[in-house]
Amino acid sequence: MKTFVAETVKRDWYVVDAAGKTLGRLATELASRLRGKHKAEYTPHVDTGDYIIVINAEKVVVTGKKETDKIYYWHTGYVGGIKDATFKEMISRRPEAVIEIAVKGMLPKGPLGRDMFRKLKVYAGNTHNHAAQQPQVLDI
C-alpha cells in the first residue's frame, strides 16, 4: 500500500459560535479540525486543516469550580515576574486568550503546529472581519 501525500489542499473557512460551549470540548474539536483529521486526505506531516473563526469567546463556560480554581500562569521575563490569573479574570481581561491557550496546547509543537495555529481566528464578540471568505457555520 502506498502512502498518500496531500500536495494541494482545499481549505474551507468555518465560523463557530462559542456561546454556552464547554471550553475543553470545544477546543478538542477545533484542534482536530485545524489539523485536518476530519478529512480523508489527512497526512500527519502536512497541514491539511481548515480556517476556523470563533466568535463569542467571552461566553465560553467551564464545568465545576474551574471558574475560580483554574489558574493561568505566565512569566514576564523579569526576575520574579511570574504572573497568574484565574479563569474568571482571564475571561474579563482577554477572552480570546482562553480559547487560544486551550487549542494551542492540543496542537503539535514545532513549525507545523505554529502554521496550524495561525489558521485559528478568535473574537470576543459576535462580529468578525472575515466576511469576504464566506465562512460556513460549523455546529459543534
From Swiss-Prot:
BP terms from Gene Ontology: negative regulation of translation; translation
Pfam families reported in the protein's UniProt record: Ribosomal_L13
GO MF annotations, alphabetized: mRNA binding; structural constituent of ribosome
Recorded GO CC terms: cytosolic large ribosomal subunit
Classification via InterPro entries: Ribosomal_uL13, Ribosomal_uL13_bac-type, Ribosomal_uL13_CS, Ribosomal_uL13_sf
Alphabetical UniProt keywords: Ribonucleoprotein, Ribosomal protein
Protein task: This protein is one of the early assembly proteins of the 50S ribosomal subunit, although it is not seen to bind rRNA by itself. It is important during the early stages of 50S assembly.
Record's subunit section: Part of the 50S ribosomal subunit.
Protein family according to the UniProt entry: Belongs to the universal ribosomal protein uL13 family.
The name this protein goes by in its record: Large ribosomal subunit protein uL13
Natural source organism: Haemophilus ducreyi (strain 35000HP / ATCC 700724)
